[in-house]
């Protein structure tokens, strides 16, 4: 019984991670076309500030999903 619950939870985490990654990329492509040339010229090692914040957001969401899964699994096992 717990095996099925854990499998479904892991599957839902993968779906939410892939959905958040897709929206982060879509947000990046839509905002990158509207930035000015002076902003693009202020790159650090080839990564613009927009890429940096999008990447940090995705990492934060992945960490949040992992911690939430651990807490939910430990709550279900009790």
Swiss-Prot record:
Secretion signal, residue range per the UniProt entry: 1-19
Gene Ontology cellular-component terms listed: plasma membrane
Keywords recorded for this protein, A-Z: Glycoprotein, Membrane, Sialic acid, Signal, Transmembrane, Transmembrane helix
Topological domain spans for side Cytoplasmic: 74-78
Domain of life: Eukaryota
Entries under InterPro entries matching the protein: Glycophorin
Gene3D superfamilies per the UniProt record, alphabetical: 1.20.5.70
Extracellular side: 20-52
Transmembrane segments: 53-73
Record's comment on post-translational modification: The N-terminal extracellular domain is heavily glycosylated on serine and threonine residues.
Membrane topology: Single-pass type I membrane protein
Expression tissues: Erythrocytes.
Record's subcellular location: Membrane
Role according to the record: This protein is a minor sialoglycoprotein in human erythrocyte membranes.
Family of the protein in this entry: Belongs to the glycophorin-A family.
Annotated protein name in UniProt: Glycophorin-E
